[in-house]
């Protein structure tokens, strides 16, 4: 595993620049005045990317996607305080993941202040093989045919724990 990016961010424009280095063409816009204070971390693990983004101001992100990946976008917060958080027009709820269909060709989301976003980018082929090995046929169907899904709490926790582990403990 390799830490590709690990930095504090001070503007929405910086988010766009950092994502450009990953192959995204996106625009980020800060919705409140004042300096943004946030954090951006990306870890590469084999063919998988793991991203953690947090900001203290609301930020809208719009643009392209990485075509060879399915992305699992998860907002990590008490959803009572995350009422302005959404992806592709869908409001975040507990055990919810968005934007993973390989049919999506764009990213559109809004980060609420202090609601971290965790994204796991998994190669389509790896995702299919893992789902078949784990006998998670229902999850694979949801992933490949929907814009978002609410998972069973145990399955959601496994996804979040696995992604957070990769972000926080990358091995050399």
Predicted regions and their residues:
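Short secondary-structure boundary segments
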Residues: 57-70, 74-75, 127-144
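N-terminal low-complexity or simple alpha-helical regulatory segments
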Residues: 1-71
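Residues in well-ordered beta-strands of folded domains
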Residues: 51-53, 73-75, 110, 121
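Short acidic (Asp/Glu) patches
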Residues: 54-59, 76-78, 100-105
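Alpha-helical bundle regulatory/interaction domains
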Residues: 2-8, 12, 16-24, 29, ...
